Amino acid sequence: MNVIDELEREQIETCKHTVPEFAPGDTVLVQVWVREGGRERVQPFEGVVIAKRKRGLNSSFTLRKTSHGEGVERVFQTYSPQIESIKVKRRGDVRQAKLYHLRELSGKAARIKEKIN
């Protein structure tokens, strides 16, 4: 095995939070450590996963939410130490891997059907 792959796997195992299985279309709540001035606090960010990038230690995912009528997107590194926890709120039933078309939609048109097990 490659030395770099071994080092990346060790870094992933030392990650302080567990990463649940989630896919594009799922609504996810991410608790992120934020530094404001001299103090740190945990800030929640809840949104729909519109993209997921699987690259081992360099994996990331993009969340989109609407805040006060304005669309907000944020990219998170999956194994970042800034992330306190990741929770899946609901599963979405979509057919695409990237949901960039949601950027042009708003209101009821941007709804995602819930996956029924």
From Swiss-Prot:
SUPFAM superfamilies: Translation proteins SH3-like domain (SSF50104). The keyword Manganese does not apply. Gene3D superfamilies: 2.30.30.790. GO terms for molecular function: structural constituent of ribosome. Keywords: Ribonucleoprotein, Ribosomal protein. GO terms for biological process: translation. GO terms for cellular component: cytosolic large ribosomal subunit. The keyword Protein biosynthesis does not apply. Disulfide bonds: none annotated. PANTHER family: LARGE RIBOSOMAL SUBUNIT PROTEIN BL19M, RIBOSOMAL PROTEIN L19. This protein is located at the 30S-50S ribosomal subunit interface and may play a role in the structure and function of the aminoacyl-tRNA binding site. Belongs to the bacterial ribosomal protein bL19 family. This is Large ribosomal subunit protein bL19.
